[in-house]
Regions:
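A sensor for short, sequence-defined functional sites
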Residues: 1-429
Length: 429
């Protein structure tokens, strides 16, 4: 049995002795949607006013209310259960989730297709074996909309899937989407094609980080760090916290802190509900670091307590005769970081100059200021394009250098005790 048929329990194989109309009708009507699934689909979509709302209602249910059995794709030999059995059990493999989603969608007048990822060979003459693929996503919805979805993760926002590295994915198509108006269209129960995956989320990506910190007269640091995010990083953290026991959340936050250049001990963690996917995901933690500042040093210099903004590396020098390639900047992303740092009373602060660099493909700005014993700093980078031509390598290298130079700037602190000391008098001549 072909894989598209295997993923459609109750599917029929077209009978070539019948007319095209009869064959297509059989493919459209089989398998029939079980009564319990029909009722569930009606319950889920009754208040929906369009295909987008119907698709999202079904997705939210299959994603969050049907528990995922975390098995590798094909671990059961693609032996799947009927939709009504999956619905009644409340649990499903990633293949089972497609079965249930497909049946609910059909009941609501929608269409979805399985997408196999993790392998790509568009030049092969033979159909690839199912065992070479690693994961199953879902694409579909109404006739004019195509959403990419992954209900197996349980916490992925609607339309957001794990980034796909391959240039193409394997899409399975059943022929109930072949139109009789095309007399050359083969009536077959299992078509397939290689399809380009989405290049990024269906909504703008952003990440906001705020740091509220204080340094004591002993040099100890305490800080509250909060992330608010949408996009690929959001999905990564939702999955990480969702799959980690609450008593281990400090470990996850500790890794996040290290990745952003913060050292110390995470003392508490607070996150938004990973399953509340309609809103951006938030992560907050408190971190302490003893002897962050050594006041005995003259002068005292510290970095701005902001996550380092990562940039794609400039391209290496192009070899003679090598075909020109584009410079990949990734999905357009807006990253905004802000810091407020309280210092001991009387501390004198010298802040560096801010930076502003603007290109058509990206913008970067930074600001630093001090008032009394409080330092504020902010940095923001906004990538506007996914890629730029290779011949702009020098310009991009200059942009990267400006950002890196800004992030390397230090804040100078003069303790109150030193400021109060009278200047040494010059020896008498």
């Amino acid at each position: 049995m072909r894989l598209a048929d295997a993923l459609t329990p109750g599917a029929v194989t077209p009978d070539p002795s019948k007319s095209r109309e009869e064959q297509l009708h059989e493919l459209e009507t089989a398998p029939r949607v079980p009564e319990v699934v029909l009722r569930k689909a009606k319950q889920l979509t009754d208040s929906a006013t369009n295909d987008a709302e119907k698709t999202r209602a079904i997705y939210d249910f299959v994603s969050a209310k049907i528990e995922t059995v975390d098995l590798p794709l094909g671990a059961t030999g693609f032996s799947v259960r009927p939709a009504d059995e999956i619905l009644g059990s409340g649990y499903a493999t990633q293949e089972d989730k497609f079965i249930l989603f497909n049946s609910l969608a059909k009941a609501a007048g929608l269409g979805v297709f399985p997408i196999l990822t993790g392998f790509c060979d568009v030049t092969a003459s033979a159909v690839p074996r199912p065992s070479v693929f690693k994961h199953l996503d879902i694409v579909g919805g109404g006739p004019h909309y195509r959403w990419w979805m992954d209900p197996s993760l349980e916490v992925a926002p609607f339309g957001l899937i794990t980034p796909i590295k391959e240039k193409f994915v394997f899409m399975l198509l059943r022929a109930n989407h072949v139109y009789l108006a095309n007399p050359n269209a083969l009536i077959d129960s299992s078509f397939w094609l290689w399809k380009e995956p989405p290049k990024g989320p269906p909504f703008p990506e952003f990440q906001k980080v705020s740091v509220n910190a204080a340094v004591t007269s002993e040099g100890d640091l305490s800080a509250k760090v909060k992330y608010t995010m949408r996009g690929d990083n959001e999905l990564l953290l939702r999955v990480a916290f969702h799959q980690t026991a609450k008593e281990k959340w400090k470990d996850v936050a500790g890794l996040l802190a290290l990745s952003d250049g913060f050292r110390g001990q995470v003392t508490s963690v607070d996150i938004s509900d990973p399953m509340a996917t309609k809103d951006p995901f938030t992560v907050g933690y408190e971190i302490t670091q003893a002897k962050f500042v050594d006041w005995s040093k003259k002068p005292v210099r510290i970095p701005a307590l902001l996550p380092q903004i990562g940039l794609p590396d400039p391209p290496a020098r192009q070899a003679a005769g090598e075909a020109a390639r584009t410079i990949e900047l990734g999905t357009p992303l807006d990253v905004e970081t802000q810091m407020t740092l309280k210092l001991p009373a009387g501390t004198v602060v010298q802040t560096p100059a801010g930076t502003s660099v603007e290109r058509d493909y990206a913008r970067f700005t930074s600001k630093y200021s001090a008032a009394a014993n409080t330092v504020t700093a902010s940095r923001r980078v906004n990538f506007l394009m996914r890629e730029i031509p290779r011949d702009r390598a020098m310009d991009y290298t200059s942009f990267v250098h400006a950002v890196q130079s800004d992030q390397a700037q230090m804040i100078t602190l003069v303790p109150a005790a030193d400021e109060a000391k009278p200047a040494k008098s010059s020896p008498k001549q």
